[in-house]
Amino acid sequence: MKVKVLLFASLREVVGSSQSAVELEPGASVEDVWTRMISLYPRLAPHTGTIAFALNSAFTNPHEALHDGDEVAFLPPVSGG
């Protein structure tokens, strides 16, 4: 199955693009997308454990199952005042 990946802020800078697409086996989870992105872009690895996950525009947990055509977003922590 194919899913669209959206990357924000520092994650976008690491990858060099705000979006990507990945192919995964049926039954894959949001976490599997993150693992695939790390394999493609190893500089994403230090962000593990600090990012938020969204599936089809709603925050979700990393174990959420995916379907073909889903949109997964990875968001780094936000700071500021």
Positions of predicted regions on the chain:
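Ubiquitin-like/PB1-type beta-grasp interaction modules and other compact soluble beta-rich domains
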Residues: 1-80
